[in-house]
Structure formats: structure tokens, C-alpha cells
């Protein structure tokens, strides 16, 4: 699992905190590694020897955006992108909505795995 550092978005948690949270979710799966980077995704893939990128799609808007990036990534690196559809129950969830709920004290338990680790 790797986190992309998006300079256009203002997160409420530092990258190291996000990595620690994800690692805590996968303690029973020691083969799962977590990292972050501030470069092109395909450059990171080359560094770690990855040959595919896996992305989740919530809706048609995600597809259009990810398809363009996937085509460009393949053109510059030969690395393919594989898409999975998000479960319908989760398709309306996005980080901006969850962030606003969290900052306003709303219960995010139905939407976030182990939210108690966020404290």
C-alpha cells in the first residue's frame, strides 16, 4: 500500500500518522508493506519492482480521471493499471466528507476501519 502525497489537498493527519494507522490495520498480515512518496506513481513502482497499479473506482467520474492517468502511466512506463469497483455501500464515501464529519465530532465508525486508532 502506498500513499500519494497530494500537495493540492490539505489533510488533517501527517503522513507518518497515516502510515502508522494503516500498518496497525494490517498487523496480522506481515507481508503488507506501507510507504509514501512524492513523485510519479510509476517511478515508485519501478523502484519497488511493481508491474501493475491497483485503483478503486467509485463512479464514472473516478473512471474518467483514473483512465486518463492509467493511459499516461502505461505510455511512459509500460506499467498497467487494474481497476476494481467499490462496493455500492461505499461508493458515496470520500475523504473530504469523512474529514468534515470527523472534525465536527460526528460518528465515523460506519465508514472508517478502527476509528479509535485516529485519536
Give the location of each predicted region.
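Nucleotidyltransferase catalytic core that binds NTPs
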Residues: 1-119
Amino acid at each position: 500500500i502506498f500513499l500519494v502525497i497530494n500537495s493540492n489537498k490539505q489533510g488533517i493527519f501527517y503522513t507518518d500518522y497515516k502510515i502508522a494507522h494503516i500498518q496497525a490495520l494490517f498487523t496480522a498480515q506481515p507481508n503488507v508493506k506501507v510507504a509514501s512518496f512524492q513523485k510519479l506513481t510509476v517511478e515508485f513502482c519501478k523502484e519497488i519492482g511493481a508491474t501493475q497499479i491497483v485503483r478503486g473506482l467509485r463512479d464514472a467520474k473516478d473512471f474518467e480521471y483514473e483512465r486518463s492517468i492509467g493511459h499516461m502511466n502505461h505510455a511512459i512506463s509500460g506499467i498497467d493499471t487494474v481497476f476494481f469497483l467499490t462496493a455500492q455501500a461505499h461508493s458515496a464515501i470520500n475523504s473530504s466528507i469523512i474529514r468534515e464529519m470527523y472534525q465536527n465530532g460526528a460518528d465515523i465508525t460506519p465508514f472508517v476501519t478502527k476509528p479509535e486508532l485516529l485519536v
